Amino acid sequence: MLFNKSFKIIFCILFFYSTPVFSFDTNSEYAFLLDYKTDQILFEKNSNKKIFPASMSKLMTLYVLFDYLDKGVVNMTDEFIISENAWRKGGAISDSSTMFAEVSSYVSIENLIRGIVIQSGNDACIAVAEGISGSEDLFATEMNFFTQKLGMKDSNFKNSTGLHHNEHYTSAKDLVILAKAIIKDFPQYYHFFSEESFTWNGIFQPNRNNLLKENIGVDGLKTGKTDQSGFSMIVSSFVNQTRLIAIVGGLPSKEKRTSEMRKLINYGQKAFKRSLVFKANQVIDTVDVWGGEESFASLAISEDINLLLDIRGRRFLNARYLYNSPVTAPIKKGDTLGKIIILNDDQIIIESNLISNKDIDGGNFIEKAVDAMGYLFN
């Protein structure tokens, strides 16, 4: 039988801060702020709205490339050619973001990554697409394969660059999913995003993510801009052992983009405090055991649950836990017996397993017979 129980989590600790606490809003057309560790949504505005991602699309180009590197299909020292197509669409002649690679030159994958991350080079993106898949069209099918794999439900990619196409779109939430996947799946390559400049073909270019130079913990990821998308930006920050991922977009200028992102990151860092809600192995209830040496098993929290809590005064969350009863012995320590769900205003914040905190061996024939009779009559 499935049991479903609820209770309130009461916080008795009061948090005091010298800085004033504020509500938050943004002039950005869309925005999304996520706690990397728990997937808590700290702020959202039009997060599922269809948007044109511009150069933020290049995060998916990089994800595909990182996957090929991780699997050993290609290596950092491998070189891809800058075809005439890549040069005309994304090179110096194109009047678009470029790493200024020369036509028919060969560029190592390592330098192409820098050309994409730091210089937002369309020529570098097309060279990667052609080097991996033979053409941008075929590469786009690989990009869309990963949208499905990562759960990016509102995305469709038509090219590697983010140059405008009416059928090339995504959402703020999907791009945050992608950014988190890059950090989580390929930490060995994330350092590229924090490099502040790159020189290629004698031409120096600074990283377009100008928040890297500010003391707010930003260490990646990407900016974007087309006439149709406006100015956009997705970043990650790491301060006080807390990583946040944030996106803003649809803004009229680079300056507005930077200021709105700075406000959003500052809000995430100042308005929330990470608190221990449950300790690992904390027992919250018991469950009946059938056919065991003991009649009950403890339902214990499987891991420390730390959440970012709004310091503006909320003192409780709701928790719901589910389990089947009875459970059948033998039971091993660490076996999953149920799950706990923590909610804020009916929004699920986090789910975690409930486990047995000890071994329970199967009982003898008499103990099993007694249990069977008891459950038969109940």
Predicted feature residues:
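Sec-dependent signal peptide recognition
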Residues: 4-12
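Hydrophobic alpha-helical segments and their boundary regions
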Residues: 7-8, 28, 93, 136, ...
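N-terminal signal peptide c-region/cleavage motif recognized by signal peptidases
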Residues: 18-20
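Active-site-adjacent loops and short helices of periplasmic peptidoglycan-processing enzymes
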Residues: 22-176, 180-184
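Domain-terminus/edge residues, biased toward the C-terminal soluble/receptor-binding domains
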Residues: 152-156, 164-169, 173-378
